[in-house]
Amino acid sequence: MYLRSRHLPRREMLKGLGVTLALPLLDAMVPAGRVWAQAPKLRLACVEIVHGAAGSTAFGLKKNLWAPAAVGRGFDLSSSSLSPLEPWRDWITIVSNTDVRSAEAFELQEVGADHFRSSAVFLTQAHPKQTQGSDVFAGTSLDQYYAKRFGQETPIPSMQLSIENVDQSGGCAYGYACVYTDTISWASPTEPLPMVRDPRVAFDQLFGVGATREERAARRLEDRSILDIVTDSIARLRKDLGAADQARLSDYLDNIREIERRLQRVEAYNSSGESRELPDAPIGVPDSFDEHAKLMFDLQALAFAADITRIFSFKLARDASSRVYPLSGSSAGFHNSSHHGDREALILDFEKINRYHVGLIPYFLEKLKNTPDGDSNVLENTLVIYGSPKGDPNVHNHKRCPLVLAGHMNGKLKGNLHLKAPDGTSMANVFLRLLHELGVDDVKSFGDSSGEFDLTTVPASATAGARG
């Protein structure tokens, strides 16, 4: 490949044997005499955490363990699980007091099955059909509505990632197929999309490493970076770039190489014969939840930077997970902790886990904010949805469910805002508004929506002391 001018097409790729490396947005990709595009493409990252929140309990509401007391802009996060987002308050919109009604039991035989139904509802806001067969039925998820409209503009329309085991098949419990628990992305009401748990698999998919599983395995045995395969192409490209583009390219390539090193360390340890906390996990899956989540966030940030895909869904845990999070300060398993028996001390212990999970999000936001995107940054042009389809997990209800939006969505969200929905408002109303802001404006209803929720205006009736 020889570049004869400083102008590059946006889809310029560096290709080598079994590798296709997309590039970040560079000044050289803007034709001479033109300015950066006025409306950068929006990215979407949907992050689900199961088991609701301590702040959705009666005690949690009183103590503002999730939603802050003040509605509007003068809110205090010091007592909230959202406190790790305080440095990012100008980038977040908290939407409290919404319900996920479609996750409730509609029939007597569905009672008690919330763990096996809820994740299918999060991004679809649709009530899943109770079946253990292949005739599953839920709804098209928010991320896939966006992917169908705009996903074909990128090499990969969308990607689905997860942390825990999501490859179970057949029926799980209470008459529900495991797929309802395994994924949050649905291409249609009958098409659940598989989620990728192994960071190495996600990396290989993003960077076109190997056409077959055998080719990818063989390349890993070579123990060299994908950048080594395209070294000559990188060198030729650099000659045609200005100083700013060279620095941007170097940062991008350094991030790729660092992720590769981390993946190699994980694989080396997991194949060393040392005992593992997750002995049944694929070789590329870290035992450390923290490292696993950060690798997945790093991959999303890289993909957004290079416009490989603009759409991710990310499942941080499997419903009914008993995983212990040592860094949270709680020694209880996630599921056991969520069944706190309405005891205040146990609710506060569960809140430690909620706070720990939220504490992972600033890592992602920092990556996005530090990634240039035209004359702005990627976080400015991204919507991150973080939430849960459960409210108080002790009683398996779906009221006052956690939901926070991050990023400015290309100016459509202003941040530094807490909005409290009227009692009985469906989370689907929020998602319908988000779909329209994402450009999917021909969708008239979503799940059990009854209208659109205004995401920028504080109601005149809101007071500084309003309870979240």
Regions found by a protein language model. Give the residues of each.
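Ligand-binding pockets and gating/stacking loops
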Residues: 1-468
